[in-house]
Amino acid sequence: MASPAAIDLAVVYEHPTWFEPLFQALDRRGVAYQRLPLAELTWDPAASPPPAPVVLSRVAMSSFLRDPEHPIFFAQALFEHWQGQGARVINASALPIDSSKARQLSLIARLGMKGPETRVVHRQANLVRAAEGLRFPVLVKADIGGSGSGIVRYDDVETLAAAARLGSAPVGVNGVSLVQEYAPRRDGEIIRVETLRGRFLYALRVESPGETFDLCPADACLARPGAAALTMTRFEPPPAIVYQVERLVQAASVEIGSVEYLIDDRDGSARIYDINGLSNFVADPLSVLGFDPHETLVDWLVEEIDRTRKQGAAA
């Protein structure tokens, strides 16, 4: 890392180990950057200038699983503050869509794409009414999720009603829940399409045993005790899917992220069910992909640093 006086890039993050491959790639390229763990930050709304001309957001929605004092909403306000002072905050624009599965599904529908049949509630008492017209089994999901958390399957209306009475169904840290038809994954797999700059980067076929909802493909996820045994292979989605994914991330203002979809085994349709504003990239990328996407990301970061520097000189 560079000295504070020579910083071109600040990387703002929450997880202590996920971004070591990125930091190593930045070191190899000689980028003048600073690591900024969110847990250590405070800021003054009347001051607190940006730490660098370019800031990279690496905020994970799953942060609430690791600390009840999570930084999700803190980071949104901080990034807007820095943007107001002229900083280029990469992927700050992704936080509103990343922090709400309801917003994601609304956007998917507005663009004419297919997601799982879903209803949105903010009170447990409304769960059964929301499920009317949906086929069981249903899933209840927290609106803000991550790493497959906050998802419970209910096979019939009686078990859903019992959960509602107990107040035990999942709810997001924002107080919002989704009631969603369970769409069985064809061949037990999902497809995760990674994007950069609003364009296709690569895709993975992720296969898992059983009905786990934790399908995170990165090293740090796979190493967790109790994590699902996943099989990941590079995959080339049909051009029509790539087109939909690119439209979706561009409309969502996701500069770096991914989209997940499955083939619904009931009718063979592709259903997009998740937009991720944070990508850890695949474990062992050279073996799985034949290239390291961290290097591609750093190429773009260097371009953004140069572009921002030129804009500053011309101002």
Predicted regions and their residues:
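Active-site nucleotide/adenylate-binding loops and adjacent lid/helix of ATP-dependent enzymes
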Residues: A2, A10, S48, F79-Q85, ...
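Short hydrophobic segments within beta-strands
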Residues: A10-V12, L196
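Conserved N-proximal alpha/beta basic substrate-recognition cap immediately N-terminal to
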Residues: E14-E117
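Short glycine-rich anion-binding loops that position phosphate/pyrophosphate groups of nucleotides
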Residues: A60-F64, I144-G145, L278
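Protein kinase-like catalytic core scaffold
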Residues: V138, L201-Y202, G257, R271-D274
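Glycine-rich phosphate/pyrophosphate-binding beta-alpha loops
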Residues: S147, N276-V288
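Phosphate-binding site of ATP-dependent enzymes
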Residues: V152-V249
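A long amphipathic alpha-helix within ATP-dependent nucleotide-binding catalytic cores
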Residues: D214-S269, T296-A314
